[in-house]
């Protein structure tokens, strides 16, 4: 039995995502301090300006970033790319981010504004070409430079930087727009010799989520010493398995950026691609990035479900990814998930029109499709298609139970190889239209 849309909307609104996903404490990398405030850019008076600083005096931090491939790249994206290109990722000691205004499609004046923001932070820390700039908010509006400039000066002049939990949480809040909760995670890890290091991640995003070689806005910082070129390779690999595998609505922003700073405050050898711990650290960063990316989907605008789309036993990874992404972006699939309708035909249709690189990846006689319950209830797997044959006698009651879960999985077994890709998506509700229908107001 399907639940009425009115009840579904009510359920979505009553889920307290803040309590579920926002930590109450954390561990943070050595040698970083952060600050944030309400500069007045946001109409609601919430925090809208934040800065991350490397305060490790013994070593400048290295940086890496992955940016949107949208042709209308925002001014802060272009300025940050210039900083990284000019420094080769070395000696980048700060990130400044604002919310409420994207500074996108603002022409040469927008570029000048972004450069002034970076230059102002550079002047405060006494280093040139050392600051990355990030912005999020409404496209087509210039930064209110008087408010941003005053806010930056206030943070430095009043020495508002801290390394405690509240400082980091407030930083996460300062980049939120339509987010229902700030996204902050942190964890300690060990190298093979027992040396401990820390990763902290912050991201924002709830809509305009369908990245390609980038993400929404996100920072990952660590106190490990990592060679700049290695850091870039590590971040790119992590993003390809995390932030490039999420979808809320199929839209790719003009401002999508994820960056990583490594300041070497932990006293250990510099990690490069020849280091014995390289693969371990790379794997840890990737798994950490997956956790951070999944929070964005959990906060999808109006979403009531978090859905893992798992495509396995594919002839190659690229086609597994293409199929997972196509299912995740399908408005019909997402609408069926919201309505708790076991309409497997929409899933199969999405698989069928996927633009595969190798047609041999899809053999209609070998494909299996299932719904998977994630709450340990039984039966865990509900088979919808078995070796290309529809299961006409599926248990509709069990299907409704699985589709009513806040977390569930769509499993697609291609039967043509051994490669696997996971995508994370959400359903599409009436609330999504409401939120985006009056975003500028």
UniProtKB/Swiss-Prot annotation:
Which EC main class describes this enzyme? transferase
Which pathway is recorded for this entry?
Answer: Amino-acid biosynthesis; L-arginine biosynthesis; L-ornithine and N-acetyl-L-glutamate from L-glutamate and N(2)-acetyl-L-ornithine (cyclic): step 1/1; Amino-acid biosynthesis; L-arginine biosynthesis; N(2)-acetyl-L-ornithine from L-glutamate: step 1/4
GO molecular function terms listed in the Swiss-Prot or TrEMBL record:
glutamate N-acetyltransferase activity; L-glutamate N-acetyltransferase activity
Return the annotated site residues (Cleavage): 214-215
Q: Which GO terms fall under biological process for this protein?
A: L-arginine biosynthetic process; ornithine biosynthetic process
**Does the keyword Mitochondrion belong to this entry?**
yes
Can you cite an annotated GO cellular component?
mitochondrial matrix
Pfam family membership, one? ArgJ
Q: Which residues are annotated as site, described as Involved in the stabilization of negative charge on the oxyanion by the formation of the oxyanion hole? A: 136-137
Q: Which keywords accompany this UniProt record?
A: Acyltransferase, Amino-acid biosynthesis, Arginine biosynthesis, Autocatalytic cleavage, Mitochondrion, Multifunctional enzyme, Transferase
Its subcellular locations are: Mitochondrion matrix
Q: Which residues form a coiled coil?
A: none
Concerning PTM, the database record says: The alpha and beta chains are autoproteolytically processed from a single precursor protein within the mitochondrion.
Q: What is its EC number?
A: 2.3.1.35, 2.3.1.1
Q: Is Mitochondrion included in the keywords of this UniProt record?
A: yes
Q: Where does substrate bind?
A: 177, 204, 215, 301, 436, 441
| Catalytically driven reaction(s) | N(2)-acetyl-L-ornithine + L-glutamate = N-acetyl-L-glutamate + L-ornithine; L-glutamate + acetyl-CoA = N-acetyl-L-glutamate + CoA + H(+)
Catalytic residues identified in the record: 215
Stated family: Belongs to the ArgJ family.
- What subunit structure does UniProt give? Heterodimer of an alpha and a beta chain.
| Other notes | This protein may be expected to contain an N-terminal transit peptide but none has been predicted.
> Which function does this protein serve?
Catalyzes two activities which are involved in the cyclic version of arginine biosynthesis: the synthesis of acetylglutamate from glutamate and acetyl-CoA, and of ornithine by transacetylation between acetylornithine and glutamate.
Q: What is this protein called?
A: Arginine biosynthesis bifunctional protein ArgJ, mitochondrial
What is the protein's species of origin?
Lachancea thermotolerans (strain ATCC 56472 / CBS 6340 / NRRL Y-8284) (Yeast)
